């Protein structure tokens, strides 16, 4: 599945070679105020219901984005919008589970990652939960602007010693935050704001892409392609050539075309 809007954005999501289904979900859309949202969700493949979780969470955020004007909003107001929508997403997952639990009790742990960026005027507001990523790209660098919510990074934040980190060697990539139906758990997400005019491209992607590509290649691959659609196709192909075994999803925004 892919979508494009001329020279502004391109999106691609495809099933990995050893996956039974594509549990990723992506959206690139405008709201009624002319602002743009790019979103990627990666449903947890280890649990039943990952595909439905990513689709439902994407739907909730898309609906909420459509009616909210981000222009001239304070950081606090934008964060409040995200928190309210995240709570609604949790509630939606719980409601869905209640309708099917009699026959699908294994859906109890359905969950997804989430990364989204909203572009309004010259601001790029980025939120994330889990390990789907966002990169800002220009000719000088590909800057990862998200930090994976996993055990390794949590241990680093706790200033754990190398020996302690090594003791968790088989669990370091375990996620420490996801979007699930667990409404009792404290909200955990991260946020940052960047400016459009310092960058050429914004890339959001799932780990099926970034785990198998060197980010330093992003700019050359994108700018060597004749258009954005070919660029996302080439990035996906390169990750497969490098033995990606996961679902691959990416949204690419041409910030030079943003006015």
From Swiss-Prot:
A family per Pfam: PP2C_2
Keyword check for Signal: no
Species assigned in the record: Mycoplasma pneumoniae (strain ATCC 29342 / M129 / Subtype 1) (Mycoplasmoides pneumoniae)
UniProt enzyme class: hydrolase
Full protein name: Putative protein phosphatase
Assigned EC number: 3.1.3.16
Organism lineage: Bacteria, Bacillati, Mycoplasmatota, Mycoplasmoidales, Mycoplasmoidaceae
GO molecular function: protein serine/threonine phosphatase activity
Keyword Methyltransferase: no
Domain PPM-type phosphatase: 8-255
Catalytic activity: O-phospho-L-seryl-[protein] + H2O = L-seryl-[protein] + phosphate; O-phospho-L-threonyl-[protein] + H2O = L-threonyl-[protein] + phosphate
PANTHER family the UniProt entry points to: PROTEIN PHOSPHATASE
SMART domains: PP2Cc (SM00332)
CDD domains, alphabetized: PP2Cc
Keywords (A to Z) from UniProt: Hydrolase, Protein phosphatase
């Amino acid at each position: 599945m892919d979508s494009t809007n001329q020279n502004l954005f391109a999106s691609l999501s495809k099933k990995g070679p050893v996956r039974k289904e594509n549990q990723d979900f992506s959206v690139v859309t405008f709201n009624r105020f002319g602002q743009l949202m790019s979103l990627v969700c990666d449903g947890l493949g280890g649990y039943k219901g990952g595909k439905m979780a990513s689709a439902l969470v994407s739907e909730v955020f898309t609906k909420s984005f459509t009616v909210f004007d981000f222009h001239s909003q304070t950081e606090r107001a934008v964060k409040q919008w995200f928190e309210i929508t995240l709570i609604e997403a949790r509630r939606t997952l719980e409601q869905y589970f209640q309708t099917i639990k009699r026959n699908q009790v294994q859906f109890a742990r359905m969950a997804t990652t989430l990364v989204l960026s909203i572009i309004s005027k010259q601001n790029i507001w980025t939120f994330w939960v889990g390990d789907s990523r966002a990169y800002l790209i220009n000719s000088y660098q590909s800057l990862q602007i998200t930090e994976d919510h996993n055990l390794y990074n949590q241990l680093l934040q706790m200033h754990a010693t190398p020996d302690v980190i090594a003791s968790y060697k088989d669990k370091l990539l375990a996620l420490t935050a996801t979007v699930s139906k667990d409404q009792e758990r404290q909200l955990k997400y991260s946020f940052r704001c960047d400016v459009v005019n310092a960058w050429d491209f914004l890339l959001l992607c799932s780990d099926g892409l970034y785990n198998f590509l060197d980010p330093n290649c992003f700019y050359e691959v994108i700018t060597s392609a004749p258009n954005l659609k070919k660029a996302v196709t080439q990035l996906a192909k390169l990750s497969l050539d490098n033995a990606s075994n996961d679902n691959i999803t990416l949204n690419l925004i041409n910030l030079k075309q943003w006015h």
